[in-house]
Amino acid sequence: MHSEEKYLHIPNNTKYPEIIVEEEEEDPSEEERSELSETDDVATPLRPSDTFPFKRRNSPCSIKMSEEHLKRLREIACPSPTPTQCSTVSKHEFQNWRINEDVMKDMMHIGTICERENVCKTSKYVYTATMASYTVTEWKLKEGNTPDEIEKISRTIEDLCQLRHKRLAPMYGYHWRLETELMVFRAHVPSGTVADLVKVSAIPQETAVRYIVHVIDALAYLHERKHVHGKLNASNLLLTISNDILLADPFIEGLPSAQKRRALLASPPEAFRSLESYPCLTPSSDIWSVGCVLVTMLTRYPPFLEHYMHFHGESLHRELVSEWCTRRQLIYSSQTLIPSASKEICELIDQIFNVDPENRPSAQNLLESHGSKSRKASLRNSLASLTTAKEPDPPKPIDDFYVEREDDEEHRKIEELRELAERGNNEGGFIPFIRWYMSRILIFSVLLVKWIGMVLCAALSLAAVAGGVFFAIFLIYNGIQIACQCSLNEGFVVLIALILLPIIILLTTLCCNNSLDRYHADVESGKVEKSRFVMKTPEKDVIVGGYILVEGSPDHDKPAEVPRKLGISEGLQSTMGNTFLGYGVDKIA
């Protein structure tokens, strides 16, 4: 008995249903189990097809399909060569790689991620029809591109849009806004890049090896399909939520270089045989860039960055050509670049940094030799951390929160300065009395000068206005004298003096009052006592001739804010993992 099938014509704008292909279960081999255990981060889209098989409702479900039908369903469900079998249509996919104006009307600009002036701008967009997020790179091309050059760029992007791999950030399409403005859409990954991690600190060796294996896996897929990335650096390695790597932003011929300095420092020796040899777009050049990225992860800087620190642009290009053509002073090896690295990393670095591109290993060879090692090392480290894990220590008394910091050099210096200040404050006699009063007079004088300056500026503004008024009065008086041929008996100078004298008195009073109010406010808040120009109030009274000139401040009157702030701010990082932190903070507060 054979099941009947009918092939219907489906329009291009039809959303395809999910296809589930049932096959006979077979015992997979060990290699297939490892491949199936790795999940794909990117859904593989269905290719628009002219025909699509549907079963009749009355066909029995228990009858198995023939091999021919299964083969046809596989071709429809998985048109692109991907490592996983996923047949659902992603909401990020468009009808065509070249996005039209109707789709762009529904695109909402969320924000700018980064921008390089006159080169490109990277932004986040949301397609309101599906609420899918995209990272869009807006390129600014030079004027005068021919239609053939524009078509070549479009074909290159369309070829890249067809690539789907679990370690590649998928590209979904492009849009020509103008002949000099191109928008390229790819997957949006909000977790950041490896470059963001490197800006903070170096990446641990185990994590760096894991990231590099992911990069090599993506390169092996690209090189197998005759594609070269050409722009491999830490800023193009996207981090997923599961802490995996997605390789993004491959080189597209015809687009400008946004980061020429990074590209030059990550280029292989064969790119500098002459000034015209750059850029070198070969699979072996990608492998050399992998080594540069690995060194960047472990040291935070590209190889020999200190040697090229003062070179930029064309001068850096000429310096690299001179280095690889004549001098050959820099040795790219694990001993010179990362001498403290593990044996596995040293072997990987020495294999990658082979000056001869013919003897440089391919991405597939590196994946076969180091991919399994990376997984075994990760599993071994996880088991070791579980076996060596210790139970947390019981909570300690809060007094140990400060005792354990005695070995800290910075803490010792602070304590010495505090003891020195306390010894100076406890000295009695006439000199501490003079220092105590003179320091406060100094603070008051500074505040007074500050307010005088502020009021002086206001007075200058007022003087400009008053000068204009007086000048107008002067012109009026002269006009009256000329018109009437008479002299006025009013004292013009006396009139001006009567106006200016109250203004000067009021401004002086204002300066003194504001300075005193500010001084008392600073004394009450403790700001004066914290100033390094002010002598601290002594613990004992300052007595001269039997008279108490300065009243002392006992220990119990001192505010407890200073030691509390020191204890929390300096010891927070060292005590973050301890279980008694919450109890200690409550007790201090």
From Swiss-Prot:
The keyword Zinc does not apply. Disulfide bonds: none annotated. It is found in: Membrane. GO terms for cellular component: cytoplasm; membrane. Residues 1-51 are annotated as: Disordered. Expressed in vulval and body wall muscles, hypodermis, seam cells and tissues next to pharynx and anus. It is a multi-pass membrane protein. Residues 97-373 form the Protein kinase domain. InterPro entries: Kinase-like_dom_sf (IPR011009), Prot_kinase_dom (IPR000719), Ser_Thr_kinase (IPR053235). Residues 20-41 have a biased composition (Acidic residues). One of its GO terms (molecular function) is protein kinase activity. Disruption phenotype: RNAi-mediated knockdown causes an increase in lifespan of about 60 percent compared to wild type but only when done at an early larval stage. Lifespan increase is associated with a decrease in the accumulation of the age pigment lipofuscin, a delayed age-onset nuclear membrane disintegration in muscles and loss of mobility. In addition, causes an increase in lipid catabolism resulting in fewer fat droplets in intestinal cells and hypodermis and lower triglycerides levels. Keywords: Membrane, Transmembrane, Transmembrane helix. The chain crosses the membrane at residues 429-449, 456-476, 491-511. The protein kinase domain is predicted to be catalytically inactive. Belongs to the protein kinase superfamily. STE Ser/Thr protein kinase family. Negatively regulates lifespan and health span probably by participating in nutrient sensing. This is Protein drl-1. It comes from Caenorhabditis elegans.
